[in-house]
From Swiss-Prot:
GO terms for biological process: mRNA processing; RNA splicing; tRNA processing. The keyword Transmembrane does not apply. One of its GO terms (molecular function) is RNA binding. This is Maturase K. PANTHER family: MATURASE K. It is found in: Plastid, Chloroplast. Usually encoded in the trnK tRNA gene intron. Probably assists in splicing its own and other chloroplast group II introns.
Amino acid sequence: MDEFQRNENKHRSWQQFFLYPLFFREDLYAIAHDHHLDRSGSSEPTEILVSHFFSFLTVKRSIRRIRKQNNSISLLRNCDRNQFSECKKNXCSKSLLEGLTVVLEVSFAMRSKHFIEGMDGWNSIRSIHCIFPLMEDKLTHSNYISDIRVPYSIHPEILVRIFRRWIRDTPSLHLLRSILHEWQNSFSRDNLQKAIITPRENTRFSLFLWNSYVHECESFLVPLVKRFFNSQSLLYGSFPDRTHFDKKMKHIVILXXRQISTKKIWLLKDSFMHYVRYGERSLIALKGTHLEVKKWRYHLFHFWQYYFHLWFQPYRIRSLELSKTYSSFLGYFLHVKMRPLVVRAKMLDNLFITDLITNELKLIAPIRSILFFLAKEKFCDISGWPISKLSWTSLSDDDILDRFDRIWINLFHYYSGSMNQDGLYHIKYILLLSCAKTLACKHKTTIRVVREQLGSELFTKSFSKEREFISSSFSKNRLKRERIWNSEISQINPLANFWQNMQNKQIEN
């Protein structure tokens, strides 16, 4: 595959027009099967690791069978003389699909690279811990937020149309169409969303379908938003006395309402947007009037349907005003609160008093939902009283302590930037007492005896890491004023993910 990535500009058209012969290269399936493939970009492994249930002879026979037959769907159906619902679990069909995905990923990488180079300042690949500082810096300058859930229950022909925009090889498109239709027919209607495209699927082919679909969505969504708001705004800069500037403009409108229309006043508002996505959830932070946001939602709703030929459920896009309502994202409640400030400026002998309004982003951890999850997992009862974890009594003491320790470490690191830290320490008390009760139940003794025997060993690791995390850079007084975002966050917390799924179900109902 190194040969495919050399001289991108020279071979780009070759990759787009002649992908079909690459599907019959046996070495590509060997690369797809190698679990120790170098992820830095080298596509030729030094050693091909073949397990006992995989045979390259089977791959060659399947390829020869495809060459002789006109129906390319036999790639999936006749792998082991079984139906595809049984064959999809076989290593043969799995490796064949991964081999096809390797070929498609090469052309997709070329297209996405040129697309990103054509968009100024656009970076679609960032870690999750960059999202929280971004929200803290940018959401305070926005007054509306659009919560979008990317629809993924789509027809296979929509995916074929997406591939047709950057793959012009007709045999390859026919092969993909056959695979996607057979994939759809092999699952029931209820499991269709989990089988074809979803960010939670672990198979390489499903991830490729999801990434291609999301890339296509973002390729038209982000430029559309920028053109929409840039065409309606006239930036006038950041004035120190901006509040009085707006008041004066409103005063002019009142005095000369017949001469100055409200549309001209809207042009003095600086509208801008910020886009962030994690999984199927996307947030677009907007600054503008209510009418602008309403028009934006209307155009997005209809443009998405006409562009993808897909019915967009109304509940999948919501426009919320940050200062009046709470929005949920990544396990946090988002809310913008206005803080009035009185600034006194002294110039020579005159004293001026200016009213300034600043916005503060409030990120709140859902403590009640975390308590509900702990009660569901038998760490406490419904009222929040700690109980023993009976299913862990068969483990050793070190394993029990490590498991409780990891739960608290993950919670503390993920919600380190929340404003309700007192609620987190209440969760900490519940886990601490539940751990002590679990050890007491295992040794058939009381909590007092467990505390006397272990002493400070209860949650020793979490306490030490917490103190190092806090005292290394910040003092206690500074912690009350500023947030700390932990850079070790690599994915959404399971508790936050559970709560976010509950919020999504409430929105759908």
